[in-house]
């Protein structure tokens, strides 16, 4: 009887390497697939693609599996990077890793794996898949400190039915331990951080290559001008560092935070104090929705939600919202407690305990700024 073939997405990191080894040990016919999703700067100081491929080949040789590389750079630019630039141009703060998982790692990659006669795919993500009553559920990882279900919330039933997450049941410390025990050449390689196509380079420098700077006024909620920004795209809601107002002589002495963007007037609004009303929200509206089960929760459903990665689940109630301009579905979340710096463009992801239900892209978060005359909510960036 032939072995079941599993194609493993291998990045050169320790997680995907241990994933491949575990599946090989379990008797699967394992094939490694290295995805190249970015073409520019292959020889630049911030690009690790070449070394990552060397690490993948070394690991494959050690554990005895075949490996190949596939170039998804064109698909990535069309499906992920173009949207990334559109969102930043509109003043929002997108999360490209969420879209990359849905469009590249679990779509383009999955399709390619099936062309290699694979039955399943596997990655080194920290999450779990469970089949129950004929449906597939996306669950948080056993190690909640490494859980990545937030980034995977847009996966659908077809994708989950073909996906394995072998690391979902173990802590990261165990993964490192296995890597050392079997002598993986990348056992001590540090975890990747930041957006995949930016790597370790300064984010503002990277963004400046693709989006023009457009300086404008920086004002307080009462309309007082306190400085000048370099372009709304280069700031995000709740940002503290890099504003350039550290010791403003007219301030209260508390740190400054980005609180809103007014696109028509090209104005950046800033406030002082971590708990300023403009930074706190009890409700949000999200669009571009995606549900793991294929349908939304019931109206009024009590659940938990994350509005950023590694945030603790915040108690809230789900509600249906008026459809968007093109008739697209939207939803609201009403939080029990005020949430800090809920950022348009980021994902609001819903949970029922350990089960990830899905979510959507935050369009607007109601806060103290909505009642302020200096920056009417209708003109703020989150209004689409």
Swiss-Prot record:
The record marks 125, 346 as: Interaction with tRNA. ATP binds at residues 9-16, 35, 124. GO terms for biological process: tRNA wobble position uridine thiolation. Residues 146-148, 308-309 are annotated as: Interaction with tRNA. GO terms for cellular component: cytoplasm. CDD domains: MnmA_TRMU-like (cd01998). Its EC number is 2.8.1.13. It holds the Pfam family tRNA_Me_trans_M. GO terms for molecular function: ATP binding; tRNA binding; tRNA-uridine 2-sulfurtransferase activity. Residues 95-97 are annotated as: Interaction with target base in tRNA. Disulfide bonds join 100-196. It comes from the Bacteria. InterPro entries: MnmA-like (IPR004506), MnmA-like_C (IPR046885), MnmA-like_central (IPR046884), MnmA-like_central_sf (IPR023382), Rossmann-like_a/b/a_fold (IPR014729). Keywords: ATP-binding, Cytoplasm, Disulfide bond, Nucleotide-binding, RNA-binding, Transferase, tRNA processing, tRNA-binding. It catalyses: S-sulfanyl-L-cysteinyl-[protein] + uridine(34) in tRNA + AH2 + ATP = 2-thiouridine(34) in tRNA + L-cysteinyl-[protein] + A + AMP + diphosphate + H(+). It is found in: Cytoplasm. Belongs to the MnmA/TRMU family. Catalyzes the 2-thiolation of uridine at the wobble position (U34) of tRNA, leading to the formation of s(2)U34. PANTHER family: MITOCHONDRIAL TRNA-SPECIFIC 2-THIOURIDYLASE 1 (PTHR11933:SF5), TRNA 5-METHYLAMINOMETHYL-2-THIOURIDYLATE -METHYLTRANSFERASE (PTHR11933). This is tRNA-specific 2-thiouridylase MnmA. It comes from Burkholderia vietnamiensis (strain G4 / LMG 22486) (Burkholderia cepacia (strain R1808)).
């Amino acid at each position: 009887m032939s072995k079941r073939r599993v194609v493993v997405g291998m990045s050169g990191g320790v997680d995907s390497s241990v994933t491949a080894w575990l599946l090989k040990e379990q008797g699967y016919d394992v094939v490694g697939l290295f995805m190249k999703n970015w073409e520019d700067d292959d020889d630049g100081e911030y690009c690790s693609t070449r070394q990552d491929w060397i690490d993948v080949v070394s690991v494959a040789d050690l554990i005895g599996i075949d490996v190949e590389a596939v170039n998804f750079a064109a698909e990535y630019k069309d499906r992920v990077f173009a949207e990334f630039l559109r969102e930043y141009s509109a003043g929002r703060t997108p999360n490209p890793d969420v879209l990359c998982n849905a469009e590249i790692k679990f779509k383009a990659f999955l399709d390619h794996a099936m062309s290699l006669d694979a039955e399943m795919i596997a990655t080194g993500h920290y999450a779990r898949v469970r089949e129950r009553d004929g449906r597939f559920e996306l669950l948080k990882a056993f190690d909640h400190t490494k859980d990545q279900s937030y980034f995977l919330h847009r996966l659908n039933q077809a994708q989950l039915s073909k996906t394995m997450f072998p690391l979902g049941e173990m802590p990261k410390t165990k993964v490192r331990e296995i890597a050392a025990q079997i002598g993986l050449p990348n056992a001590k390689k540090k975890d990747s951080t930041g957006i995949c196509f930016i790597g370790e380079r300064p984010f503002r420098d990277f963004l400046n290559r693709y989006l023009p700077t457009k300086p404008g006024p920086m004002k307080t909620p009462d309309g007082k001008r306190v400085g000048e920004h370099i372009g709304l795209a280069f700031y995000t809601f709740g940002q503290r560092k890099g504003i350039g107002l550290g010791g403003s002589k007219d301030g209260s002495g508390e740190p400054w935070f980005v609180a809103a963007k007014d696109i028509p007037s090209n104005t950046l609004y800033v406030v002082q104090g971590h708990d300023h009303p403009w930074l706190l929200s009890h409700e949000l509206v999200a669009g571009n929705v995606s549900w793991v089960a294929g349908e939304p929760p019931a109206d009024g459903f009590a659940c938990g939600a994350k509005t950023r990665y590694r945030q603790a689940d915040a108690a809230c109630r789900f509600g249906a919202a008026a459809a968007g301009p093109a008739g697209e579905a939207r939803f609201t979340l009403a939080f029990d407690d005020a949430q800090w710096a809920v950022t348009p463009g980021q994902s609001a992801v819903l949970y029922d305990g350990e089960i990830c239900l899905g979510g959507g892209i935050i369009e607007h978060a109601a806060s103290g700024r909505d009642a302020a005359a200096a920056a009417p909510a209708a003109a703020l960036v989150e209004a689409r």
